Structure formats: C-alpha cells, structure tokens
C-alpha cells in the first residue's frame, strides 16, 4: 500500500471522508490583518483548501475622520474584499446577532471551501455600553450581517443572504423616538437611523456635532435622510441634522459636518 498512500492527497478524499477530518480554524484580529496580513489572507482564500479564518473586528469605523476618503482608507471592509475572491465562503456577523453568528459559523465549519468570518466585536475600553455600540453599528449599516456561499446557487441572489439586517428593503431602518414636548408631554417621532446616528454613540465622533437652540434653526438645515438623497449641487447649500434626545428628555436638533454625514 506504500505507493497508493504516497499518491493520496486530501483532494482525493470524498465529501464524506473530508467531513471526518477536523476543521482547520485560524483566529485573528482585524488590526493584524490590516497591519500587513491582508496579502496572506488573500492568498489563503485562493488556495481552494478548507481552511477557515475567523477575524475579530472591534473597529466599526465610526470614529472621527477629516473626510469621507479618510474614513474609507482607515477602515476597509474586509468582508467585501473577501467576496471578490468568489470561490470563498464569507460570513460577516456581529456579537449583537448571536443566532446569525452561530448559524453562520456552522455553515463555515462544514464547508469544504476556504472561508472567512468577520465578527463585529465592541471596543471594550470605551465608556459606552458594549452592546449599545454593536446595536448602533448594526442598525446604522456600519456592520451589516451577510453570508456569501458560492455553493448556495448559480445566481448572486441565491448565494448572497442579507438576513437579519433590519428593514433590508429600505435605505435606512426606521425607529420610534420617544421624547418630551415643550410642555413636558410625551411625544413620539419616527426617524431613520443612519450611519451618522450610529457614530453619535462614539464619544470621539461627537466633535462633528453641534446642538442648536430653536432660535438658530433655518431652512438650510435638512434632515440627514433628505440630505443623503440630494444631488451634489443642492446638497452643497444645505446642512444635515439629526434629532437627539437631551438628558431632560427634550428633543433637540443637532447639525453635522458634511464629513460626518
């Protein structure tokens, strides 16, 4: 049997035989990947070998930046980069969505393809509650959950799953804001929840926000959802704002820098 065993490699095993082999799982942090390991990860995803990489990402990209271009440069989306390899299974999930994460990791470990799981984790050192960080990033589309499985079908829609993201048929999810009116009466208002709303949870990002008294409101100030849907020319004459609830429960208008929007 020596000659036969010498020629045997893992590609000669059947699917049932491969299922008996313990999966190879690599655990890494996003900082190390972006710090010089991106090329190695790309090479691994092209090998065709059933090696599974789990990356813990505690950078939601919601921190302060000087321009939108700087934001993109400091926080590339690892999950989207991995999808470009086409033949790899890619999971992007969050500790805030444990059911999605559990199911996705199960698919990952059973796959005979190279795979990557990007798991959003809170920045534990920040003063904001970790789960508020994660929920805000998820609702603000900063860390959307998805699963790309090339074996799920022959079309993009069959291979790409976007559950359990909130209100996936809308640009932004809508939430009900509860606050106090001018006379202290309870009021409710439906608002979209955008990337900028999520960034407000991060103390470092609040330097791009200013709360205005009603006397400073003007027609040039527009809700951020309307601002984002404007063409470039009219947008340049407007200032985006969001509604925030003050410590006393009062609803206040907060304008944003254009980079923040």
Predicted regions and their residues:
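Core active-site phosphate/anionic-ligand binding loop and the adjoining beta-turn-alpha structural block
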Residues: 51, 55-160
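Cofactor-binding active-site loop characterized by glycine-rich and histidine/acidic residues
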Residues: 1-52, 61, 72-85
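Flexible, low-complexity linker and terminal segments
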Residues: 123-261
């Amino acid at each position: 049997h020596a000659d036969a065993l010498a020629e045997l490699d893992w590609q000669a095993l059947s699917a049932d035989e491969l299922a008996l082999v313990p999966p190879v799982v690599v655990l890494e942090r996003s900082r190390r990947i972006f710090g010089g390991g991106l090329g190695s990860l790309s090479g691994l995803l092209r090998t065709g070998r059933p090696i599974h990489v789990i990356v813990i990402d505690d950078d939601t990209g919601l921190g302060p930046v000087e321009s939108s271009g700087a934001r993109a440069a400091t926080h590339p989306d690892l999950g989207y980069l991995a999808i470009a390899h086409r033949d790899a299974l890619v999971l992007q999930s969050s500790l805030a969505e444990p059911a999605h994460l559990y199911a996705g990791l199960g698919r990952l470990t059973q796959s005979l393809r190279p795979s990557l799981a990007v798991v959003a984790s809170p920045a534990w050192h920040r003063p904001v509650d970790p789960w508020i960080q994660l929920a805000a990033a998820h609702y603000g589309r900063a860390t959307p959950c998805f699963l790309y499985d090339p074996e799920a079908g022959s079309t993009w829609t069959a291979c790409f799953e976007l559950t359990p993201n909130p209100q996936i048929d809308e640009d932004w999810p809508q939430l009900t804001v509860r606050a106090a009116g001018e006379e202290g009466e309870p009021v409710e208002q439906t608002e979209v929840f955008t990337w900028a709303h999520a960034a407000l949870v991060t103390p470092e990002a609040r330097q791009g926000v200013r709360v205005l008294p009603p006397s400073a409101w003007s027609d040039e100030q527009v809700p951020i959802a309307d601002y984002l849907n404007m063409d470039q020319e009219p947008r340049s004459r407007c200032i985006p704002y969001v509604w925030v609830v003050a410590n006393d429960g009062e609803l206040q208008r907060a304008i944003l820098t254009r980079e923040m929007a």
